[in-house]
Amino acid sequence: MRNYYEKRLSALVFECDQEHYWVNPLMMKEKIVKVASLVIGKRVETISASATLHDLVNALNVHHVGALVVSPDGKKIEGIVSERDVVRAMPGRLNELTDVRVHELMTADVITCTPDSSVASLMTVMTERRIRHVPVVDESGNLLSIISIGDVVKAHINELDVERKALSDYVNS
């Protein structure tokens, strides 16, 4: 087992002296986790832009999700609407909430990713833009799935745990 990790480390580190290590950028490619690995078999819930706020709240509750993709057909994306959008709509509008439609609450300029997007780059975008849900689309822009910040964080934690275990095994062997 020690040989395996020595080979891995020597492949990752291509040059070193007593104080510095230089990582081989070609070897870093294999560490890239793709969005596709997180959304395989994951169902995405959608809602119509003409649905009522009542319909939206019920759908969020029934499906146990924090956001729904707004779509007329389950493929094309018109927007995304989340629990935060519902909360933001409430101040000053409590009397008229029964008349509010999803298209009034949704974010129409939707940030999306593809199955080939890296989880690391998606984490950066979600953090910088302060968004918690990103629809996953194919090359034609059709909806495939949705990924949450929780999915991204779990993948990152798993990646760090594997790396920690590998280093621990190497040091202890």
Segments the model singles out, each with a brief description of its role:
Residues 2-173:
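Tandem CBS (Cystathionine beta-synthase) repeat/Bateman regulatory domains
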